[in-house]
UniProtKB/Swiss-Prot annotation:
It is found in: Nucleus inner membrane. Keywords: Glycoprotein, Membrane, Nucleus, Signal, Transmembrane, Transmembrane helix. Glycans are attached at residues 69, 414. Residues 414-479 are annotated as: Disordered. The chain crosses the membrane at residues 172-192, 203-223, 233-253, 276-296, 301-321. Its main location: nucleus. It comes from Danio rerio (Zebrafish). This is Nuclear envelope integral membrane protein 2. GO terms for biological process: oocyte maturation. PANTHER family: AT07567P-RELATED, NUCLEAR ENVELOPE INTEGRAL MEMBRANE PROTEIN 2. Contributes to nuclear envelope stiffness in germ cells. Involved in male and female fertility.
């Protein structure tokens, strides 16, 4: 979806550049008359004029235009741009593509008695056409000034581009767009409404394209005959707006706002493309527009490019990891002395934590004392005393210390097992024919099991007195 957004924005930028390249050509004709700002002169016949800004274009001039007004008793119009691009001898590939677009979708040439013409850093030429060569007219050219409509379009374009995500997820935008689409483009609205009944996606796209074409033709027809419709058929127009608006609102209210993630992303991309178009019509100086759009595209595409670069790097490192030999970490076993030292350290730390926990104000001391066998020993432990007695320590050292009973059993068991193994090897070397049938089996010296002291229950013994269970009413005697 991010790639689709970038493609839509780039396509919008190219279309805007094609349109701007047509009307911002540098015309330098020897027979054109130079005019200055805030000047009014009388002329006759069709002729071309060139206006020079006279000053360097500044940042505040990107929303500025100059106004050309012609007044006459007959139909005299201002034509801008005065001619189309030379498609017979194109200069570059962009001109060829622009000519191709111009051939199938010709742009409209402005023919009005008053025009707002944008500023460029070269002379701007326009033409005054009159029906006869002796027709006189008055031409008035004003200086550059801030075009409020262009500035408003620029602000709206920025708002749509940066706020497209929040706007598309707004319920107000959903209902407003649905009602407007139902009124203006009824065929498109009905096609989207009946989408679930169309079996194939290709057929749906064909129907959507046909509905869009019919809606466009209807809008063009209404705009061409707007005056007659408003004056003669205003009641029918009002009834159509009310009925289609209420029906569209009811359908939108039934289905609710859009929650599909892909649809919302597509709407966001379309909204950003509309914002780019508004920026194009809001900025009158084309270089400033292209710089701004380049910055916006970089801001939009950089996160996608960064994620793509990180994905490529991760794949490359994963590919290199297949050829690198994994080294297993060397593990060193602890010695007996290190094992004893770590045991003492961790035991001391655990005892300190236990002592700290028992000295807290919220510790249930009385309940704990009632459950202990020797509360005095527990109190001495809390006063930084030892957790074992001297006798217990001596018994532990005698059993597990150096020269203790535990290591003696281990040593003797190992020696007994080695003697048994040697006896087995000698018995295998004897002949198979010399078998002693009555010889008793040799018993293996098994290691004596480790004797552990009996466990001591920390809770005091409590005598259990069984309580008689009450009899049910059904079990009682009736006599």
């Amino acid at each position: 979806m991010e790639k689709l957004a970038a493609f839509i924005l780039v396509l919008t930028l190219l279309c805007a550049y094609w349109q701007s390249a047509e009307g911002i050509r540098e015309y330098s004709y020897a027979d054109c008359t130079d005019v200055k700002g805030d000047s009014a002169h009388r002329y006759s016949g069709s002729r071309c004029f060139c206006y020079s800004p006279g000053t360097v274009i500044k940042w505040k001039d990107i929303w500025s235009t100059f106004k050309v007004n012609v007044s006459s008793n007959v139909d005299v119009v201002v034509v801008f741009p005065m001619e189309t691009i030379n498609c017979h001898h194109p200069d570059d590939l962009l001109t060829v593509m622009n000519c191709f677009v111009e051939h199938y979708w010709p742009s409209t040439v402005q023919r009005e008695t008053s025009l707002e013409i944008p500023l460029v850093d070269v002379d701007i030429c326009f033409m005054i056409k009159s029906p006869r060569s002796n027709t006189e007219y008055t031409l008035h050219v004003s200086n550059k000034r801030l075009n409020r409509m262009c500035f408003l379009l620029f602000v709206c374009g920025l708002i749509l581009f940066f706020g497209a995500r929040n706007i598309c997820r707004s319920s107000l935008f959903f209902y407003t767009t649905g009602v407007s689409l139902g009124i203006i483009a009824t065929f498109v609205f009905l096609t989207l409404l009946l989408r679930n009944f169309v079996p194939k996606r290709g057929l749906f796209l064909v129907l959507l394209g046909a509905g869009s074409g019919l809606s466009y033709m209807g809008i063009q027809r209404v705009l061409n005959e707007w005056d007659d419709i408003v004056t003669e058929h205003w009641m029918e127009l009002l009834a159509y707006v009310l009925i289609s608006g209420l029906f569209s609102f009811a359908v939108c209210y039934k289905h609710g706002p859009i929650t599909n993630k892909h649809t919302l992303n597509f709407m966001t991309c379309s909204m950003q493309a509309v914002g780019i178009v508004l920026l194009y019509y809001g900025i009158t100086f084309p270089p400033a527009y292209f710089v701004l759009v380049a910055v916006l595209l970089c801001w939009k595409i950089l996160p996608l490019a960064w994620s793509l670069l990180m994905g490529i790097c991760s794949l490359f490192y994963s590919f290199l990891a297949l050829f690198r030999r994994r080294r297993r970490p060397t593990v060193r076993l602890l010695t007996e002395e290190e094992y004893r030292e770590q045991g003492e350290i961790h035991t001391r730390a655990s005892l300190d934590e236990l002592r700290e926990y028992c000295n807290r104000p919220g510790f249930p001391a009385w309940e704990t004392v009632l459950r202990l066998r020797s509360p005095q020993r527990f109190a001495e432990f809390l006063r930084q005393g030892s957790h074992i007695t001297q006798e217990e320590h001596q018994n532990h050292e005698n059993h597990y210390g150096l020269g203790g009973a535990y290591y003696e059993n281990v040593i003797f068991n190992n020696s007994s097992s080695s003697d048994t193994q040697s006896h087995r090897e000698e018995a295998e070397d004897n002949s198979e024919d010399e078998i002693v049938g009555n010889s008793p089996p040799v018993l293996n010296n098994l290691p004596s099991p480790t004797i552990y002291p009996p466990t001591i229950c920390p809770y005091p013994p409590v005598t259990y007195t069984p309580q008689p269970e009450p009899l049910d009413p059904e079990d009682q005697d009736f006599f």
